[in-house]
Amino acid sequence: MFSFFKKKIVVPHVRLTGVIGTAGRFKQGMDLAGQRTILKKAFSFKKIKHVAISINSPGGSPVQSHLIYSYIKQLAKEKKVKVIIFAEDVAASGGYLISCAGDEIYANSSSIIGSIGVISASFGFKDLIKKIGIERRVYTAGKNKSTLDPFVDEKEEDVKRLKNIQLELHADFIKVVEASRGSKLKDPEKNNIFTGEFW
């Protein structure tokens, strides 16, 4: 007896959107704690061969980016499932790092992709508080506890230490991209792939 009914192919789909990290009480951010359940559920379907993940994120916390990336890789390995990534408006910086958990990455011709780098930003308020007559008093135990205090002049050793941390994070990011994309990378140094540039 022949069956004329074809089995439906099931491909679970998850959407990961927003700035990566804990954004605050009234603003939702994307972190592993908030995405763990839905990711686990997507990989829990029986007899699936693929899981599709859409990403729309400009990046954010390098820690949460790597945690989400690692969790997707872990689930894919445990369930022996391939991951297909779809970049929406933007998959940049940490958003691109998460994308590297995919076996394949697809992007629209207008999607913003890349920004493989690390950035830190701050302000200096020393002259401002002096101008308005505010005296700031800080007491610390540990000479480096007030590193990069925005209310005093920058110290060269503080900036150097921050730069070293950034270089370590950047190196880790590059390793993830190289391990994921492999032969798909065309002369990274020549094409500015790891300079923080985006396309």
Can you name each region flagged by the protein language model?
Residues 1-81, 90-97, 101-183:
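Small-residue-centered hinge/linker elements
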Residues 173-199:
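Secondary-structure end/capping motifs
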Residues 84-92, 191-197:
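Glycine-rich beta-to-alpha transition loops that act as phosphate-gripper elements at the mouths
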